[in-house]
């Protein structure tokens, strides 16, 4: 629900500011799961949705967006510096639709809309605090927009200033280098989707982290397949990176500490990739014996 609650906060914020009129359109650029959340919220509240997504994302996520009646626009996967990057493309499209759609349109802009971070500061963080009875020593997760990590960090640090906040970063992202050396620099690549940021978004502004880890695809997949085999949980790549990061943080802090992370994506949305023998073989990645 991390993406669904952010989607709802973004829409409610736009309503409160008078930016979103009845029957209006919500436009967003997303690697998938926020798009699904926005499409769901739009349908439930009587709005239209146009979702811009890199064509490299899994077919299952594209199908889920269409199931909620949203219009899906697929674009090439290019860096943020390119004007045709899915995020920047969606911003221009929102401007065009705002002028042409009779009921207007807004750009959700999850990366730089701090209503995203606020959703987690007001809901996710306090829920973690309550569910652990305040006995949380560390929180760690990956970053896409940064809303979850920054919002939860804000909430937990308000309750316990010495709580340890960690970043789990896939290869190909630049935040591990930023939080360890001060330089935004990426290395390698990853099959993970929707995480791995190359810039400091508005949601990340002001965030400091105590621990940062770089997680390889091999380490991520080992965790994902272990969750299936030993916990009966079929999860996606972001969850794999998150849990791998939590294991690293737990080892660093030592026994007796409570570490929290987020299991945020269903494996069913990645069947064509991380649960696909042909895809894994093509990428030279490990294949579980049961697949």
Label the model's feature ranges.
Residues 1-291:
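PLP-dependent amino-acid enzyme catalytic core
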